[in-house]
């Protein structure tokens, strides 16, 4: 008669007890299933799109891209943020459930980049609108750098306490700037307001009669030189 053979698992596994805290269990579940909301407005987002391929395979980190902010707990901003897009970004962030995280990817997102030079329509840093957890510099950052930023965010999540994060978000709110616009008269009739037209100071301060008298007294050879 053949003897009864027990499975290998029953023969080798001993009784064991796993102890943990609810906070550690919550952190482990969140860092293992980060669902990012992809907010790409410029060329940096192309580098993040390459992570979806088989070469980098960002699915191993539990990243599942979502198209709705109510189903995401991570927003990854990549590219230039303009003044017109700023309210939409803040609205998307406010619609995300707690706890939520932000990764600022690229120089244009962190500081405005080259597009913020003498520009009135570019936000010089996304941290002026929403709180940022990880800054990822570069123009554009490589996919390996994006993976490193996600790894650092996972380490941050594993060490945090949920109550402390909610308290800090309620106290340390990000600041916003109120822009005031001057409403002018309608210009559809062709009558432009002279106050809105730019006049160089070196010609506007000189009377027209004096300017033309000086121009007629100077020869063409002197004007060229």
Swiss-Prot record:
Q: What are its cofactors? A: [4Fe-4S] cluster
Per the annotation, how and in what number is the cofactor bound? Answer: Binds 1 [4Fe-4S] cluster.
Q: How does it sit in the membrane?
A: Peripheral membrane protein
* Protein EC: 7.1.1.-
A GO molecular function assigned to this protein is: iron ion binding
Summary of the function given for this chain in its UniProt record: NDH shuttles electrons from NAD(P)H:plastoquinone, via FMN and iron-sulfur (Fe-S) centers, to quinones in the photosynthetic chain and possibly in a chloroplast respiratory chain. The immediate electron acceptor for the enzyme in this species is believed to be plastoquinone. Couples the redox reaction to proton translocation, and thus conserves the redox energy in a proton gradient.
Q: Could you say which protein family the record assigns here?
A: Belongs to the complex I 20 kDa subunit family.
Protein's UniProt name: NAD(P)H-quinone oxidoreductase subunit K, chloroplastic
């Amino acid at each position: 008669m053949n003897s009864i053979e027990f499975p290998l698992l029953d023969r080798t596994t001993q009784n064991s007890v796993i102890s943990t805290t609810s906070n550690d269990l919550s952190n482990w579940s969140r860092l293992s299933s980060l669902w990012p909301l992809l907010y790409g407005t410029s060329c940096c987002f192309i580098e993040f799109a390459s992570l979806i391929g088989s070469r980098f395979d960002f699915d191993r980190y539990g990243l599942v891209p979502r198209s709705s902010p109510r189903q995401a707990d991570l927003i990854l901003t990549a590219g230039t943020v303009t003044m017109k897009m700023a309210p939409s970004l803040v609205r998307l962030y406010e619609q995300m459930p707690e706890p939520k995280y932000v990764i600022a990817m690229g120089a244009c997102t962190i500081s405005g980049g080259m597009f913020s030079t003498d520009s009135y329509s570019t936000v010089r840093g996304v941290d002026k609108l929403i709180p940022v957890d990880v800054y990822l510099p570069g123009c554009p950052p490589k996919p390996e750098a994006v993976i490193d930023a996600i790894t650092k965010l996972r380490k941050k999540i594993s060490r945090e306490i949920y109550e402390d994060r909610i308290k800090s978000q309620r106290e340390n709110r990000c600041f916003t700037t109120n822009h005031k616009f001057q409403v002018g008269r309608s210009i559809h009739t062709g009558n432009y307001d002279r106050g809105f037209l730019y006049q160089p100071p070196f010609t506007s301060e000189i009377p027209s009669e004096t300017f033309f008298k000086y121009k007629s007294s100077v020869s063409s050879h002197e004007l060229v030189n």
